[in-house]
């Protein structure tokens, strides 16, 4: 294991601790009695007193944070008092795979579309293809996701499902929590196709801004690489235009794109809240929104903490991938 990977792994606990501290402070910053916020203002006094004792709200703040960290280390994110005291971790375990599934689908669309537009813009710089591609990219950044979602529903609602993860008549085996994977493993082709049709529209809507960002970064990186000496050498040696672009240029232009992936994943996790609301997607976005409406502060805190840790974990993977793509980083070169 290289020193670079070791350094990244050493900082991971510090980052996760900082995330937990921020979530704790935000939860304690809620005005009023936290026990009443959890159990509800109309809850009996005995219930609120019991919550104060169980959750340590009657103790000093440093002690409360110590108890909070102790529960986190045991995997205890709290309970949903308005849903029969069900564990928040159990609820999140049902919702998180759906959001990750939507996020990965949107990232696949953004990466494929962004690379295509960026490469075409760089190869045909100054032409109509370049102008059209960058216009699409600019529109993708400018249009609000919720408004675009409503337009998609109006335009394609007669052809594609506009709500939910799967048709109510299908019941796939719950093996992984990911609807696409579970329907595929079931061997029912019609059910899998229905799952694909359900994820298609929200994934397209959610991917618009990351697609535009990928296209612009790819174009800028490709233009820089295409003007380098080794590209001119490859062309002079008779390499085909497609090989020059896809093998020589794209490989060396990939570093900024890989760096962008981690940031895009974070945006997609945040953007999923709006997208899931528009398309009634049963994921973390709708879970957080319903928790806000029901003043389930422990559910909100648990969801935010899990999403933040997911984002940190994905960025760690991207950093490690970056180190394998660029050996200078892996070996600690000062030129990196």
Where are the model-predicted features located?
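Hydrophobic alpha-helical transmembrane segments of membrane transport/permease proteins
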Residues: 15-66, 156-191
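Alpha-helical transmembrane segments of integral membrane proteins
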Residues: 2-3, 96-129, 145, 173-336
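Hydrophobic alpha-helical segments of integral membrane proteins
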Residues: 9, 51, 61-77, 88, ...
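N-terminal signal-anchor/signal peptide hydrophobic helix marking the start
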Residues: 6-16
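Pore- or pathway-lining transmembrane helices of multi-pass membrane proteins that form conduits
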Residues: 130-154
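An internal, D/E-rich "acidic patch" concept
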Residues: 58-115
């Amino acid at each position: 294991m290289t020193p670079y990977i070791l350094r990244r792994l050493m900082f991971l606990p510090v980052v996760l601790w900082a995330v937990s501290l921020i979530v704790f402070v935000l939860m304690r910053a809620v005005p009023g009695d936290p026990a009443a916020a959890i159990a509800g203002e109309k809850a009996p006094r005995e219930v609120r007193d019991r919550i104060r004792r169980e959750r340590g709200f009657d103790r000093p703040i440093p002690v409360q944070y110590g108890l909070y960290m102790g529960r986190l280390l045991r995997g205890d994110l709290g309970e949903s008092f308005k849903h029969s005291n069900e564990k928040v971790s159990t609820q999140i375990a049902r919702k998180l795979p759906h959001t990750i599934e939507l996020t990965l689908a949107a990232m696949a669309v953004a990466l494929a579309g962004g690379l295509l537009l960026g490469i075409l813009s760089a190869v045909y710089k100054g032409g109509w293809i370049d102008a059209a591609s960058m216009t699409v990219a600019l529109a993708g950044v400018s249009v609000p996701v919720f408004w675009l979602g409503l337009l998609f529903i109006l335009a394609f609602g007669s052809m594609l499902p506009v709500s939910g993860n799967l048709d109510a008549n299908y019941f796939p085996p719950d093996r992984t929590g990911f609807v696409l994977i579970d329907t595929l493993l079931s061997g029912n082709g019609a059910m899998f196709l229905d799952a694909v049709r359900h994820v298609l529209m929200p994934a397209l809507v959610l991917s618009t801004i990351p697609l535009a960002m990928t296209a612009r970064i790819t174009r800028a990186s490709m233009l820089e690489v295409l003007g380098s000496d080794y590209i001119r050498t490859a062309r002079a040696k008779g390499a085909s235009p497609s090989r020059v672009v896809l093998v020589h240029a794209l490989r060396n232009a990939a570093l900024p794109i890989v760096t962008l992936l981690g940031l895009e994943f974070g945006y997609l996790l945040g953007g999923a809240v709006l997208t899931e609301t528009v398309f009634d997607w049963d994921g973390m976005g709708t879970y957080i929104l319903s928790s806000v409406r029901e003043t389930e502060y422990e559910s909100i805190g648990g969801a935010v903490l899990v999403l933040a840790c997911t984002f940190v974990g994905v960025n760690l993977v991207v950093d490690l991938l970056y180190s394998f793509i660029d050996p200078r980083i892996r070996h600690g070169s000062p030129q990196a």
